[in-house]
Amino acid sequence: RSEGAVILVIAEHRDGKLNRATLETVAAAQTAGGPEKIAVLGSGVDAVAAELAAADAAEVVVVDDPALEDYTADGMVLALEQLIAAEQPERVFLPHTYQARDFAPALAARINRPLVTDCVAVKDSGYVRPMFQGKLQADIAVDGPHLATFQIGSYRADAMKSGATPAPVRKAAVAIDAAKIRQKPEAPFKEAKQAVDLSQAERIVSVGRGIKAQEHLQLAEQLAQAMGAEIAASRPICDAGWLPMDRQIGSSGQTVAPKLYVALGISGAIQHRVGMLGARP
């Protein structure tokens, strides 16, 4: 890669609230040799842009358009195709969220750039990403301009460096033809009414089959309540129906990066550990 080549981080937010995974992705960009620009797309996103301006970044670039009020893959691709053409970043970083996974492949194809997904680290001229459910880690080398997504928890949100002064905020000259957006916006997907986004939790109490009996789960729930933590579990607990599947952490569940992770009765199998490797030691 070219020394000092621009990295463009694509922010993710919903209902005026910034997804913490964005801060993690900014932290990843800050370790990669920058300078970093942060792009905020949506409608009425001045508050989100101002929040991100606190980061140690070259600038925050805003694409504000009524067509982006509700998320659609087409809208994001149309806007980012123009923005990337104008800004010419060598690398585009995104959090590896459901939303980014929805539109990033189409964006990469549209602008003819390689896409490296689910990265856990920036390394030399490339990236590190897990393979075979986290049993191996591969070094991925990429030549030329490209896109990369970062696994939630691979970098810490609180590791993002703040600037001495707010970064400048600039409106980008991007025009979106709403007629080209084929999707109809719908409510964000949730697996169940009780679904919880554990990736945003700062404290988690997680239980495994080592707790032996379902009645012991109540003690863990009381501990979580006393700590102001979310309750979670390894797969055997959820498979047994002791907790709903949206509480599962691991390769087939959620990936988390809390400040405190308390594991009770969990053996530490790799399938579980890949879901909580970002937890603070």
Regions from the PLM with identified roles:
Residues 1-281:
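N-terminal glycine-rich FAD/FM-binding segment characteristic of electron-transfer flavoproteins
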